[in-house]
Amino acid sequence: MNIFRILGDVSHLLAIIILLLKMWKSKSCAGISGKSQLLFALVFTTRYLDLFTVFISPYNTVMKIIFLACAYVTVYLIYGKLRKSYDSENDTFRLEFLLVPVIGLSFLENYEFTPLEILWTFSIYLESVAILPQLFMISKTGEAESITTHYLFFLGLYRVLYLANWIWRYHTEKFYDQIAVVSGVVQTIFYFDFFYLYVTKVLKGKKLSLPMPV
């Protein structure tokens, strides 16, 4: 396992911790897209169905359990404990616009036509677009809290580091996972504008704001 994957996992975990701490301390989930969090929970669920049948390493197993647990806790807080603060009026992205094409693509483009492999492929494709409801929500409200932007930054950084991981693995092991790499590139592209605003505004102490949709 190379340093890029480790740093990617740390960045991913840090993003989730930032989000959970934000909700726990403020007793509010305002500004957080419950739909994006539902998609991420679905991503981890379909990707880690082999949790109890395939063992790679203690690190791999522990990280799977942590990500699954955090995903379900996040969904519970948004739709359960903190549901009164959930901004459902602005979290209006149509999930079927993502789920239908992702499901179709998972059946058409995969490495092996078996249930577990199709579900794994589904999770990779879905993760690449799961953040769209959150970005749509920010564009709809016109702004985002600083904690939410930090969460999105580390989530985007995780994808960039994982792309570096794939490049490193190809260079050192001649290993290339086309589905994971292409999906990772697509996901990273969605963060480009956000990264620019994060560096030019948030890191300078300014509030991140986006043009309101017409």
From Swiss-Prot:
Molecular functions per Gene Ontology: ER retention sequence binding; KDEL sequence binding
Keywords: Cytoplasmic vesicle, Endoplasmic reticulum, ER-Golgi transport, Golgi apparatus, Membrane, Protein transport, Receptor, Transmembrane, Transmembrane helix, Transport
Marked site: Important for recycling of cargo proteins with the sequence motif K-D-E-L from the Golgi to the endoplasmic reticulum: 193
Subcellular location: Endoplasmic reticulum membrane; Golgi apparatus membrane; Cytoplasmic vesicle, COPI-coated vesicle membrane
Pfam families linked to this entry: ER_lumen_recept
Predominant localisation class: endoplasmic reticulum
Lumenal-side positions: 1-4, 53-58, 111-116, 169-178
Membrane topology: Multi-pass membrane protein
Record has Transport as a keyword: yes
Location of region: Important for recycling of cargo proteins with the sequence motif K-D-E-L from the Golgi to the endoplasmic reticulum: 204-207
Listed PROSITE patterns: ER_LUMEN_RECEPTOR_1, ER_LUMEN_RECEPTOR_2
Transmembrane segments: 5-24, 33-52, 59-79, 93-110, 117-135, 150-168, 179-199
GO cellular component: a single term: cis-Golgi network
Site (Interaction with the K-D-E-L motif on target proteins): 5, 117
Span list, region Interaction with the K-D-E-L motif on target proteins: 47-48, 159-169
Residues on Cytoplasmic side: 25-32, 80-92, 136-149, 200-214
InterPro entries (UniProt xref): ER_ret_rcpt
GO biological process: protein retention in ER lumen; protein transport; retrograde vesicle-mediated transport, Golgi to endoplasmic reticulum
Domain notes for this protein: Binds the C-terminal sequence motif K-D-E-L in a hydrophilic cavity between the transmembrane domains. This triggers a conformation change that exposes a Lys-rich patch on the cytosolic surface of the protein. This patch mediates recycling from the Golgi to the endoplasmic reticulum, probably via COPI vesicles.
Family statement: Belongs to the ERD2 family.
Function: Receptor for the C-terminal sequence motif K-D-E-L that is present on endoplasmic reticulum resident proteins and that mediates their recycling from the Golgi back to the endoplasmic reticulum.
Official protein name in the record: ER lumen protein-retaining receptor 3
Organism name: Xenopus laevis (African clawed frog)
Gene: kdelr3
